[in-house]
């Protein structure tokens, strides 16, 4: 299976691919992780899926979406600032055109079970966010993520460190932290083939 990485903003994304992203997010966040999220017609979306959002996503040969990220500028509303400000402790939420929030990272479970390609999809998505950052002048990503993803980042040597109160928080059933991921040569080396 070939993995194609695509990038689009909210206004330009093809409708079938956008539905594929929302369907994957429903499968991962609502069904697998059992997050208490509003969904309709087996699709998960929220108020941050708006004209400020960009998407980096993976499709297979059949154009099925099997991995995705949502990117939000920190100059407007974004999840860490608006939904999870308590995770910041005494720290002020980043507000910088060169800092972008990553959210709704999802990789389809069926991809890894059927053809063992989840690792390839995951790595290609991380390569894509690195390349996107370099091309757009992004100097740092911030994200509220699971400690499993934090461990994964450390294992593949993507630079990251906890910010905010630096504590582990239970968000739904997911043990979560706030991470900063600086865009630097270490990140490039970690995601290079």
UniProtKB/Swiss-Prot annotation:
Q: Which EC number applies?
A: 2.3.1.184
Arranged from A to Z, the UniProt key words for this protein are: Autoinducer synthesis, Luminescence, Quorum sensing, S-adenosyl-L-methionine, Transferase
Among InterPro entries, the record links this protein to: Acyl_CoA_acyltransferase, Autoind_synth_CS, Autoind_synthase
A Pfam family this chain is assigned to:
Autoind_synth
Q: Does the keyword Transferase apply?
A: yes
Is Ribonucleoprotein set as a keyword in this record? no
Q: Which reaction does it catalyse?
A: a fatty acyl-[ACP] + S-adenosyl-L-methionine = an N-acyl-L-homoserine lactone + S-methyl-5'-thioadenosine + holo-[ACP] + H(+)
- Supply the PROSITE patterns for this chain: AUTOINDUCER_SYNTH_1, AUTOINDUCER_SYNTH_2
Tell me, what is one Gene Ontology molecular-function annotation carried by this entry? N-acyl homoserine lactone synthase activity
List this protein's GO terms for biological process: bioluminescence; quorum sensing; signal transduction
Q: What Gene3D superfamilies does the annotation carry?
A: 3.40.630.30
Give the protein's biological function: Required for the synthesis of OHHL (N-(3-oxohexanoyl)-L-homoserine lactone) also known as VAI or N-(beta-ketocaproyl)homoserine lactone or 3-oxo-N-(tetrahydro-2-oxo-3-furanyl)-hexanamide, an autoinducer molecule which binds to LuxR and thus acts in bioluminescence regulation.
Membership in a protein family: Belongs to the autoinducer synthase family.
- Which named protein is this? Acyl-homoserine-lactone synthase
Protein's organism? Aliivibrio fischeri (strain ATCC 700601 / ES114) (Vibrio fischeri)
């Amino acid at each position: 299976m070939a993995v194609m990485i695509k990038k689009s903003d909210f206004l330009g994304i093809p409708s079938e691919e956008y539905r594929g992203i929302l369907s994957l997010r429903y499968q991962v966040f609502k069904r697998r992780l059992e997050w208490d999220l509003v969904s309709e017609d087996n699709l998960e979306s929220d108020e941050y899926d708006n004209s400020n959002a960009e998407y980096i996503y993976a499709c297979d040969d059949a154009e099925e979406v099997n991995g995705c990220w949502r990117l939000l500028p920190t100059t407007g509303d974004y999840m860490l600032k608006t939904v999870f400000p308590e995770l910041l402790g005494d720290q002020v939420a980043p507000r910088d055109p060169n800092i972008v929030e990553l959210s709704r990272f999802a990789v389809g479970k069926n991809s890894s079970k059927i053809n063992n390609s989840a690792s390839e999809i995951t790595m290609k998505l991380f390569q894509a966010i690195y390349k996107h950052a370099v091309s757009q002048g992004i100097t740092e990503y911030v994200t509220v993520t699971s400690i499993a993803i934090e461990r994964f980042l450390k294992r593949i040597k993507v630079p990251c460190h906890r910010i905010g109160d630096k504590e582990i928080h239970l968000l739904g059933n997911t043990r979560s932290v706030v991470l900063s991921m600086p865009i630097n040569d270490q990140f490039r080396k970690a995601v290079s083939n």
